[in-house]
């Protein structure tokens, strides 16, 4: 819809109506860098753009309204984006398009079940083809392979090898309020896909710290 007078007035009304209740931030993608959005919410910025705006800084949080499209064989660039997001505090995440495939469970003439979409409901029916099947999980919430990439990028504990020969790692606690001593960490060491060592360790690492 773009931006303009009505959106300016709507922003001011929301701020007044919400005052003293929750004082929630407002975001409106098409406002871009104008004053009637409390965060900058672009669509599909590249990893290099996120790196650039993170390094330069911004007058408000940057939270892409869409930054990864989970349709088909996708989300391969997610980690490149999250490396920048984790590095710069003005980058505060983003929204994946989207969570779940929007298919409907039906049966074919042989009784086999499948997820129907688009043209499955007739050639003369309105259809966006398979564009409604763009989630990281199936309609029954079974995960797509893309879910593994999302899980890795969003994990709250990260490990970085500092001296592999001597088994030394840095452990980063990405939680904001939880010490890692609340968890028991299990690990395995593999050689040619065979487990040669396994163990458990408890670590005292404060939120947003590494050890």
Task: List each model region and its residues.
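Short proline/glycine- and polar residue-rich coil/turn motifs
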Residues: 203-210
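Short hydrophobic alpha-helix segments
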Residues: 199-201
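Extended substrate-binding grooves/exosites of carbohydrate-active enzymes
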Residues: 1-170, 175-181, 186-195
């Amino acid at each position: 819809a773009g931006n303009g007078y009505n959106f300016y007035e709507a922003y001011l009304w929301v701020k007044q109506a919400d005052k003293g209740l929750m004082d929630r931030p407002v975001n409106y993608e098409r406002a871009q860098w104008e004053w009637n959005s409390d965060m900058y919410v672009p669509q599909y910025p590249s990893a290099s753009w996120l790196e650039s705006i993170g390094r330069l800084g911004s007058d408000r949080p940057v939270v892409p309204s869409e930054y990864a499209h989970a349709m088909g064989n996708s989300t391969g660039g997610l980690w490149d984006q999250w490396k920048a997001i984790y590095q710069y505090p003005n980058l505060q995440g983003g929204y994946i398009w989207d969570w779940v495939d929007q298919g409907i469970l039906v049966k074919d003439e042989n009784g086999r079940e499948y997820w129907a979409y688009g043209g499955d409901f007739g050639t003369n029916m309105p259809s966006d083809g398979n564009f409604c099947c763009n989630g990281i999980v199936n309609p029954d919430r079974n995960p797509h392979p893309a879910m593994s990439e999302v899980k890795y990028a969003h994990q709250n504990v990260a490990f970085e090898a500092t001296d592999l020969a001597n088994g030394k790692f840095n452990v980063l606690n990405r939680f904001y309020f939880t010490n890692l001593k609340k968890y028991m960490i299990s690990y395995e060491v593999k050689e040619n896909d065979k487990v040669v060592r396994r163990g458990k360790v408890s670590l005292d690492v404060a939120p947003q710290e590494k050890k």
